[in-house]
Amino acid sequence: MSVVSLLGVNVLNNPAKFVDKYEFEITFECLEQLEKDLEWKLTYVGSATSDQYDQELDSLLVGPIPVGVNKFIFEADAPNISRIPDAEILGVTVILLTCAYDGREFIRVGYYVNNEYDSEELNAEPPVKPIIERVKRNVLAEKPRVTRFAIKWDSEASAPAEYPPEQPEADLVADGDEYGAEEADEEAAEEAEEEAKSKGKASSGEDAEMAGVEHEGENAADEDELSDDGSVDIEGESEDDLEEEEEGEGEGEADGDAMEVDSAEKPATSTAKPVSVAS
């Protein structure tokens, strides 16, 4: 939790000429007594392509700071024209209002600044050498970008957690032994599983073949027994046996006629069971 909280910033002289001072009314709240002062700074970004043109316009130490809500006026000089490339004077740039405690920055407020001439003619056809006296600035005070940082204040308890955290055990194992170890274990486990599956398929196939062979042998033996029992030696039959069979056939035909008469007198009974059809 921050001991100092920024409540608001008002840009007082806006819009203004490029060479005029910057003025800010800053309001902040202090939650506990601080041992050191707050350092406020205003930085002008001279170029979007390189930070070598950045200028610290002014800095201010504020303190001792009482607990509660505090307000003050921060003034800063205009940037030095000689340190800004001519091509970077006109157009949009940025100013940064920052505050630090004991050399540790905890708040940063960024504003876009539009620099242009005060007449439409000069804006339509700007001269090669900028006319600084005719340039005006407009700070987009309604759209600041605020960034907060966690810092250590007076007590050790207020210090933020270190990032990344210390991991001394991570240095005990060489990177070559650490990286790829899990992948190697997974590949070995997959290979073992595939090998076990292939062995299981092979063993089950052998059992099926053996069972089929035994079954075929049993069927063949049964067929042999049936052929032996049902075989008839036609040549071994005697003429007497044949005559007896012919007489028996005659009697059977007579009996058959009687059976046909009996069956005609009795109606045939159906043995079919009703079948329900599921729709």
From Swiss-Prot:
This is Histone chaperone ASF1. The gene is ASF1. Residues 268-279 have a biased composition (Polar residues). The keyword Transferase does not apply. Belongs to the ASF1 family. Keywords: Chaperone, Chromatin regulator, Nucleus, Transcription, Transcription regulation. GO terms for cellular component: chromatin; nucleus. It is found in: Nucleus. Residues 179-279 are annotated as: Disordered. Interacts with histone H3 and histone H4. Residues 179-194, 219-262 have a biased composition (Acidic residues). InterPro entries: ASF1-like, ASF1-like_sf, Hist_deposition_Asf1. GO terms for biological process: DNA replication-dependent chromatin assembly; nucleosome assembly; nucleosome disassembly. Disulfide bonds: none annotated. It comes from the Eukaryota.
